[in-house]
Amino acid sequence: RQDVHKDATFYHGSIADYRFMTEVLRKEKVDGVIHFAAYSLVGESMTNPYKYYDNNMSGTNVLLKAMVDCGVNNIVFSSTAATYGEAQNIPILETDPTNPTNVYGETKLAMERMINWYHKAHGANYVSLRYFNVAGAHPSGVIGEKHDPETHLIPIILQVASGRREAINVFGDDYDTADGTCIRDYIHVCD
């Protein structure tokens, strides 16, 4: 709650709770949703896939139904580059084939498809953003991610550099770049 702006109203509830979702959407007269509600640990998704199917996919289904029933026609979806799996081409283009290699990526791709069908059935506007590694924060430190345990690449690298973690494994050394590692585009949190 300390991360919520003082002028914002904080609601604690589940994306999978239809009644809760419709109450908030109606009370706040929401006209668009930014959908970040998903479990996102690749390793955990492989050992506990049902948790990911239930929250990520079923929860999104409930959200979309609530949006339809409340007349909310705009959604920005936080997806993942994990939907591509092992890319056939570098750099990866949005038009490249998707082939997730883990449950997390599979659920995110399914969520994208659900949102696309929501668009086709109800004329809703949407965009799915396929991030690679989320890193950084607003200069104030107010906007950004905090994980415990840390699971994201850049913070793990910083933990190694500061001696709080012994090592990091780097996978992929045969890309057509100066050091053999892949190159990624990025968007700044302030953009």
Residue ranges and their predicted role:
Residues 116-191:
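NAD(P)-dependent short-chain dehydrogenase/reductase
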Residues 1-134:
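N-terminal Rossmann-like NAD(P)+-binding domain of SDR-like oxidoreductases, especially those catalyzing
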